[in-house]
Amino acid sequence: MSNTTDIKKPYPIIGLEVHVQLKTKTKAFCRCENKYGGNPNSRICPVCMGMPGMLPVFNRQVLHDSILAGHALNCKIARVTKFDRKNYMYPDLPKGYQISQYDKPICYEGYLTIENDDGTTKNIRITRAHMEEDAGKLIHLEDGTNNSYVDYNRCGAPLLETVSEPDITSPDEAVKYLKTLKEIFQYIGISDCNMEEGSLRCDANISMMIPQADGTEVNTPIAEIKNMNSFSNVKKALEYEMIRQVEEYEKTGEVNNGTNKTTRGYDDSKGVTVFQRSKEGESDYRYFPEPDLPHLEVSDEVIEQQRERLPELPAPKRKRFVAQYGITEYDALTLSASLALANYFEDVCKATKYYKKASNVVLTDICAILNAENITIEEFSIPAAHIADLVNQMGDGKISSWIGKDVFAKMMATGKTATAIVTEENLAQMDNDDEMENICRGVIDANPKSVEDYHKGKDNALKFLMGQVMKQTKGKANPVKATELLKGMLG
């Protein structure tokens, strides 16, 4: 017999709907430029504005990119797919309907594997990924007038909506899922997934499972959460909603009956979700097949062509980096976070055997520049071969890591190679043992207090003496040899 002390805590069940804007040159059903920004309503035409008599012409690249995404998400690809009209009225939708996919999505029954902090993995099932067009953007003025404007530039932009099963059981898992999905879509090159520009948008469906004393569970009404424009906001919104739903259940006892789903918006300034409306059902949208677009028959050849476009994805790349280059899992995770950075690192490794040093230079020196100047690795000025030259100078013992940082700075300033800078400025490590011994002896004689501290077992004393040696040699002392000499002289 169980008792009340055995009752489990309430837990969430979460499903995510993620819209990504595809990076095609033109929109989904017209020839307007598909690009963020520009003057309001400058990238529109009669087709994307829904003018009478205008017919859509499908952009084939949208299909190809969607199939590629399906392969990356382990989905089945439909051999026959079609478009449908999703009917609703809103100021940002000039046609009064959205061209979407209802019962025959291009991709279905897939999964995405996320990695937990403890190294275990979990598969989140993908219900479907379907093609659709974007709506415009409402701009609400904050000048006290309550006026709103509509920018239709985004109207008709191609979207891929990925819908997960409710397999996610915590806000942290939700964020891991989103980050993994974003990483994959960026790797395969179908979207830049910039949340600030709206090219990745997420809605979360959440309800709470409330265990009962008799061992059963009840399910609170589902809430769809919108207006989450960052991963941190997704986490905060879900955490708030978990508490709100449990408190609401304790007050009212209301459970999910299939008709009481609501839509709520996340208010970042207050950290709360706010009721917006009762959620529409599928029947409210009055889906019907798009009469101006034929069914699409997808051949095996097209499906295989897109499979061949699939690059090595982040998870297997990380495992290979650890095995092939002997770097840590953390470094592999950071290096593989962007395909461009991963490729740059591998280009460095093609010209050196000192893989760990290469990893250190890329992750510390180069990434510091990227962050400070807010640039990407593609915009970084030093070729990978020149970085490999710097790594080889350090790995071969020609210069110390201390001098290496100075050489890197001079490479940035002058564009010269590491070899040229080391030669021109005589920066190679000292190879005269007698000179090194004299310098070490002089440092010991000049610092009796540190010598006394060393004999008392204070670790920092040796580091201080070593620093003095490096200072006197302007970083040209071999640190291993200098340390051995100091220890031998100190006894």
Regions found by a protein language model. Name each.
Residues 351-352, 358, 366-381, 389-394, ...:
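M16/insulysin-pitrilysin zinc metalloprotease superfamily fold
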Residues 377-388, 392, 401-471:
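Strongly charged, low-complexity linkers/loops
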Residues 23, 209, 243, 342, ...:
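Amphipathic alpha-helical core segments of compact helical bundles
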